[in-house]
């Protein structure tokens, strides 16, 4: 049929341009998520114990536009022709590199030197984990003084119980050794353990933890069960440093560079959409 091949070729070209529109759109969506992640890192640059998040990408399926075949003289071509269909966000992972330690005037400021996490009891009764050691003593519901987070969540000891001290202790005199033992001065003003130790827990895969609000993490199947440093001799134990807080590990300069790269990638993908749209309009005009 006359002209049939020409119409078919025009249709294929238009389909290819529509494909480029969607491919560039996936790039814009991925870079928008990347910018969102970077903005969140910068917003938490002063959040105690915050861990930088990194956006990871994965390419979408490639489409075969020509399979392996032979040339005019019968020789086999070495490869096929494939075109990519875009990109997607594969994961947003946390970088659990330790942040720098900042001195604090608070007696209940604690930093963890190592891979461990503090354990806290949530309002729903579940156990959550955090690197934020900005703690305080509050009045317990059944009397005494309870070690808690700034949100009022009880901090747990090595037995998984809330840390509650009787009113016989002067809270300002409580000290904590590097192994997490709570100590109180004797008559000679020498600190003596009182039989309570702050719990510190590790995970085989901390990147598998689910991030929650208030710098909390929740255990998942991907993270594995919490490992109690006090009862497991196969892990390198962390140290608790009183009078210090762990700063966010966000590197502002790195995030600004990442922001510029993401912005440029977003801009180039938008230009690809504009170019594809103009080419599609020109192809449509050929039919007139």
Task: Tell where the protein language model's regions lie, with residue ranges.
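Active-site anion-handling motifs in enzyme catalytic cores
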Residues: 1
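Amphipathic alpha-helical polymerization modules
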Residues: 4-288
């Amino acid at each position: 049929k006359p002209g049939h091949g020409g119409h078919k070729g025009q249709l294929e070209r238009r389909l290819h341009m529509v494909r480029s529109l969607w491919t560039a759109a996936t790039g814009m969506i991925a870079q928008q998520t990347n910018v969102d992640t970077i903005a969140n890192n910068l917003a938490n640059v002063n959040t105690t114990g915050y861990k930088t998040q990194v956006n990871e990408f994965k390419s979408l399926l490639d489409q075969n536009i020509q399979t392996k075949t032979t040339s005019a003289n019968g020789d086999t071509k070495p490869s096929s022709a494939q075109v990519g269909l875009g990109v997607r966000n594969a994961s947003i992972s946390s970088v659990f590199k330790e942040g720098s330690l900042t001195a604090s005037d608070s007696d209940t400021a604690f930093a963890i030197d190592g891979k461990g996490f503090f354990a806290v009891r949530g309002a729903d009764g579940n156990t959550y984990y955090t690197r934020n050691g900005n703690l305080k003593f509050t009045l317990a519901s059944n009397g005494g003084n309870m070690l808690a987070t700034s949100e009022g969540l009880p901090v747990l000891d090595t037995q998984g119980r809330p840390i509650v001290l009787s009113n016989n202790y002067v809270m300002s005199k409580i000290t904590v050794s590097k192994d997490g033992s709570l100590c109180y001065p004797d008559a000679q003003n020498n600190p003596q353990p009182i039989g309570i130790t702050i719990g510190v827990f590790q995970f085989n895969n901390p990147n598998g933890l689910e991030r929650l609000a208030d710098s909390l993490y929740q255990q998942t199947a991907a993270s594995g069960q919490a490992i109690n440093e006090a009862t497991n001799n196969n892990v390198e134990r962390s140290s608790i440093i009183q009078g210090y807080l762990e700063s966010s590990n966000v590197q502002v300069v790195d995030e600004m560079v990442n922001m510029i790269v993401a912005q440029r990638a977003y801009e180039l993908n938008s230009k690809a959409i504009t170019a594809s749209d103009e080419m599609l309009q020109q192809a449509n005009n050929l039919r007139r």
